Structure formats: structure tokens, C-alpha cells
Amino acid sequence: MSTLPFDVRNISWRTLPDIPHVAFWIYAVDEEKRIVDILFKFDAGAKIVLHRHKADYVTLVLQGELRIYRPTGELKEIRPVGSYVAGKADGEPHTEGGGDQDVIAFFSNRGVDELVYEILDDNLAVVATLGMTEFRALFDAQPPQPSTLVA
């Protein structure tokens, strides 16, 4: 089901070369509070890499439908626009992606010890990780957000 578009004019989407079908913008990396806040854009009709969340998180879907798939490829869940879902670290590995249109979803990762995501192969073996260190480097490499000051 198509939803109203989320205004992304002020977002300079970033990508990672080995993770297709997803773009991101990092809003916060706070080592002291152990928070990593990210806006993701998932391609319509595509799935990202198999992964596992290593920190508790909440998601808020801002555009489209976020589709969650089990490691077998079976559709597990559809989160429509406006869905707010909390998840726990070390849940079931999964892939995710968009339905009929690109999905934009805000992820707030909380209580991050070091790892945020484990990237998995088809046998559920860890092939890469993304943690506080990597997200700090990606955040620092982003262009600054436009100023919100009026004067």
C-alpha cells in the first residue's frame, strides 16, 4: 500500500558498498548514553542482508511498509506507516525491506555495549559487524545537517 512520501530534501543519504538495498543517515552516536539513532531507507521490493540486532531498539515507520523476513525467506511481519515497535537484542536473525514503495524507518538503538548489528551468511555465521566504533566513524564522515537557527 502506497503512503504519503516523507520529505527527505535535507537528508544526504549514505550507503555502504557491501550492503545493497539500504541507505542511511545517522542522527546520533552517543557513547556515554549508549545510543545510536539512524534513519534507514529500504528499497521497494528488495531485501537487505541477513542480520541480527545486538542492542535493544525501537523503530518508527515513516513511509511505506517495513517487511520483516525469517532467515528462510518467509514473510514474518509487515509494519505499516506509523508503526512503533520495540525489539530486544539477540532476537531472531532476519532480513527486511520495502513493500511496494521505498520504506523510511527511524531506528533508535539503546543500551549499546559495542555491537549494534551482526551481518550473517546463509548458515547464520557472522561475516561482519557494525558497532559503536563504525557508526561513530560514519557519523563523523557525514556532512553537517542544515542549521535550524532562525537568526
Explain the meaning of each model-derived region.
Residues 1-34, 120-151:
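A short, N-terminal "cap"/entry segment at the start of jelly-roll beta-barrel domains
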